[in-house]
Amino acid sequence: MRPYPIHCVSIVIPVYNEEDSLPELLRRTEAACKQLRHDYEIVLVDDGSRDASAQLLEEAASVVDSPFVAVILNRNYGQHAAIMAGFEQCKGDVVITLDADLQNPPEEIPRLVAEAEKGFDVVGTVRGNRQDSALRRYPSKLINLAVQRSTGVAMSDYGCMLRAYRRTIIDAMLACRERSTFIPILANSFARHTTEIPVAHAEREHGDSKYSPMRLINLMFDLITCMTTTPLRLLSIVGFAMAGLGVLFAAALIFMRLAFGAGWAGDGLFVLFAVLFVFTGGQFIGMGLLGEYLGRMYSDVRARPRFFIEKVLRGHPATPAPAITVDGLTSNSTSDQVLS
């Protein structure tokens, strides 16, 4: 692993109904970036907010020589789609994602940049003394464990979006066109060198969590279907096992019928019904998993855009990063649209 030269750092922050926390977020994020030895830009993506968040972002980006970039989506597409929109607009050699709720302090940004300079493709974070309810913490631990087993990447907190990505990883993710994306897992599928560092975690001061129970369930299905095809393989294995047990059970019923007569067969009627219900339940579970994959393929075949950007406002053009080749991976700058 070689040191990674950095010329520009981009901070990508998805925003959804966060007008109360935005002034402090902008102030603290800019103050943290001023500690860097590199050029920087702060890309804030409004994900169809219904409050004044979009107006606040436009005002911040309209100031002369402002480091802020406002990306306004025409409606709510979800956190990960909004981050991907920010990836398309950012120019940094290292890109850091950060939530707008200030539960992860922006003051951690210099630490992530320092780790990325060592040559890591992805720098993850682990929330210390997590300030969430038990109903959020324990399911998160189970999901993180399942992701580790499925991906083989030893990262322990996939739910924390405070992360740093090398430019080549960003370009690789942008080349993927699937509609449903979970960015930490997608990034790790392209990363060669990954690491994690502990970060602080604070209580949310303004507003409520944007993840309702139904959205958490949808996220769980996205995790299952985006990271592995193991459920499909497991479905086949379980199907063969159930078929084998069914054959053995039928053989046992025939033997008992021949050995003990018709009276015994009648006594086993309810057992047969119970087994039938178990098999039927297994079929429905399998069809449900298969339906998740078919729905994903249907969305990809439609080839709808992941998001639609209504406008992009920049205080000044970001310094374009030159092409860099490290460990055989080449990073190229993308084109930019500057609106005033």
Curated annotation (Swiss-Prot):
<keyword id="KW-0472">Membrane</keyword>
<comment type="pathway">
    <text>Glycolipid biosynthesis; 4-amino-4-deoxy-alpha-L-arabinose undecaprenyl phosphate biosynthesis; 4-amino-4-deoxy-alpha-L-arabinose undecaprenyl phosphate from UDP-4-deoxy-4-formamido-beta-L-arabinose and undecaprenyl phosphate: step 1/2.</text>
</comment>
<protein>
    <recommendedName>
        <fullName>Undecaprenyl-phosphate 4-deoxy-4-formamido-L-arabinose transferase</fullName>
        <ecNumber>2.4.2.53</ecNumber>
    </recommendedName>
</protein>
<dbReference type="InterPro" id="IPR029044">
    <property type="entry name" value="Nucleotide-diphossugar_trans"/>
</dbReference>
<comment type="pathway">
    <text>Bacterial outer membrane biogenesis; lipopolysaccharide biosynthesis.</text>
</comment>
<comment type="function">
    <text>Catalyzes the transfer of 4-deoxy-4-formamido-L-arabinose from UDP to undecaprenyl phosphate. The modified arabinose is attached to lipid A and is required for resistance to polymyxin and cationic antimicrobial peptides.</text>
</comment>
<dbReference type="GO" id="GO:0016780">
    <property type="term" value="F:phosphotransferase activity, for other substituted phosphate groups"/>
</dbReference>
<keyword id="KW-0441">Lipid A biosynthesis</keyword>
<feature type="transmembrane region" description="Helical">
    <location>
        <begin position="269"/>
        <end position="289"/>
    </location>
</feature>
<dbReference type="GO" id="GO:0009245">
    <property type="term" value="P:lipid A biosynthetic process"/>
</dbReference>
<keyword id="KW-1133">Transmembrane helix</keyword>
<dbReference type="InterPro" id="IPR022857">
    <property type="entry name" value="ArnC_tfrase"/>
</dbReference>
<keyword id="KW-0443">Lipid metabolism</keyword>
<dbReference type="GO" id="GO:0036108">
    <property type="term" value="P:4-amino-4-deoxy-alpha-L-arabinopyranosyl undecaprenyl phosphate biosynthetic process"/>
</dbReference>
<keyword id="KW-0328">Glycosyltransferase</keyword>
<feature type="transmembrane region" description="Helical">
    <location>
        <begin position="235"/>
        <end position="255"/>
    </location>
</feature>
<keyword id="KW-1003">Cell membrane</keyword>
<dbReference type="GO" id="GO:0005886">
    <property type="term" value="C:plasma membrane"/>
</dbReference>
<dbReference type="InterPro" id="IPR050256">
    <property type="entry name" value="Glycosyltransferase_2"/>
</dbReference>
<keyword id="KW-0808">Transferase</keyword>
<keyword id="KW-0812">Transmembrane</keyword>
<keyword id="KW-0448">Lipopolysaccharide biosynthesis</keyword>
<dbReference type="GO" id="GO:0009103">
    <property type="term" value="P:lipopolysaccharide biosynthetic process"/>
</dbReference>
<dbReference type="Pfam" id="PF00535">
    <property type="entry name" value="Glycos_transf_2"/>
</dbReference>
<dbReference type="GO" id="GO:0099621">
    <property type="term" value="F:undecaprenyl-phosphate 4-deoxy-4-formamido-L-arabinose transferase activity"/>
</dbReference>
<keyword id="KW-0444">Lipid biosynthesis</keyword>
<keyword id="KW-0997">Cell inner membrane</keyword>
<dbReference type="GO" id="GO:0046677">
    <property type="term" value="P:response to antibiotic"/>
</dbReference>
<keyword id="KW-0046">Antibiotic resistance</keyword>
<dbReference type="InterPro" id="IPR001173">
    <property type="entry name" value="Glyco_trans_2-like"/>
</dbReference>
<comment type="similarity">
    <text>Belongs to the glycosyltransferase 2 family.</text>
</comment>
